[in-house]
C-alpha cells in the first residue's frame, strides 16, 4: 500500500504538476509516511496476524482510491511515468537505473542502521520483544508504534518513487497482494531482525525468481512435457 502511495504521488506530482523529481523524492515518502501514520491509529490495539490483515486491508483501500481518482491516476488502465531526472541529467538506461537504485539502497541501509542503534530503535526492539516489559520500562507504546508506521511508510514510499520512475509505467496490477507476500518472504528468508538479512533475502528471492526458476522450468518442461507456467509457480513455491 505504501509503495503504491509513493509511486502514484510522485508520478502525479512530477508529470502532472511539474514538481522536480528530486523534490518528489522528499515529498512522496512523506505522503506515504502520513498514510502509515493514519493506519497506525486503528492498529494500535492489534497485534500478530490481525495486524497483518489490517495492513493488507489498507492495501485494498488504496487500490480502490487509485481507481476512484482516475482523473489523475487513469484508474486501472495504468499511468505512464517519466524517467528520473537529477542534476539536469535524465536517467534512462538499465545500468543507470541500477546504479540509481543501488545508491539509494545503500543510503536506506545506512539510515536504517542509524535508526536501529538510536533510542528509537532500542524502543522498537523492546516493544518487539515484550510490550508489557517495554511499557513497564516507561516506553510509550502508542507513540513508538505510530512512529514505526510512519517510518515504514517513509521507506516504502521512497521505494515506490524509484519503482515508478525507473519502470516508466505503473498500474494497480503492480501492487497486488502477491507483492506483499513477496516482501514478507524476503524478510523471513533473510531474517526479520536484521537489516542486512533483509537485503540478502531480497537478493536471494530476486535471483531465485528471475534466474534459477526459469532454468529449472525449461529443464522440467523438457523432461515431463508439462505447462511451463505451472512449473514456474511450483518451483518458486517450493
How would you name each of these model-derived features?
Residues 1-238:
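Transmembrane alpha-helices and adjacent helix-loop boundaries
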Amino acid at each position: 500500500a505504501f509503495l503504491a502511495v509513493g509511486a502514484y504521488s510522485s508520478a502525479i506530482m512530477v508529470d502532472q504538476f511539474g514538481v522536480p523529481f528530486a523534490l518528489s523524492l522528499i515529498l512522496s515518502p512523506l505522503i506515504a509516511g502520513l498514510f502509515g501514520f493514519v493506519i497506525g491509529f486503528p492498529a494500535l490495539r492489534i497485534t500478530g496476524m490481525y495486524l497483518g490483515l489490517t495492513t493488507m486491508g489498507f492495501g485494498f483501500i488504496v487500490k480502490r482510491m487509485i481507481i476512484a481518482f482516475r482523473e489523475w491516476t487513469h484508474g486501472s488502465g495504468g499511468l505512464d511515468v517519466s524517467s528520473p531526472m537529477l542534476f539536469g541529467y535524465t536517467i534512462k538506461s538499465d545500468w543507470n537505473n541500477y546504479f540509481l537504485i543501488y545508491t539509494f539502497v545503500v543510503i536506506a541501509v545506512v539510515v536504517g542502521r542509524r535508526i536501529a542503534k538510536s533510542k528509537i530503535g532500542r524502543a522498537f526492539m523492546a516493544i518487539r520483544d515484550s510490550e508489557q516489559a517495554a511499557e513497564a520500562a516507561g516506553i510509550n507504546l502508542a507513540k513508538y508504534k505510530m512512529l514505526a508506521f510512519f517510518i515504514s511508510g517513509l521507506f516504502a514510499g521512497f521505494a515506490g518513487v524509484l519503482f515508478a520512475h525507473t519502470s516508466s509505467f505503473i498500474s494497480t496490477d503492480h501492487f497486488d497482494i502477491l507483492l506483499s507476500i513477496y516482501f514478507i518472504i524476503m524478510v523471513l528468508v533473510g531474517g526479520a531482525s536484521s537489516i542486512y538479512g533483509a537485503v540478502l533475502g531480497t537478493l536471494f528471492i530476486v535471483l531465485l525468481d528471475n534466474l534459477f526458476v526459469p532454468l529449472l522450468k525449461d529443464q522440467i518442461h523438457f523432461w515431463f512435457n508439462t505447462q511451463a507456467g505451472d512449473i514456474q509457480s511450483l518451483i518458486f513455491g517450493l
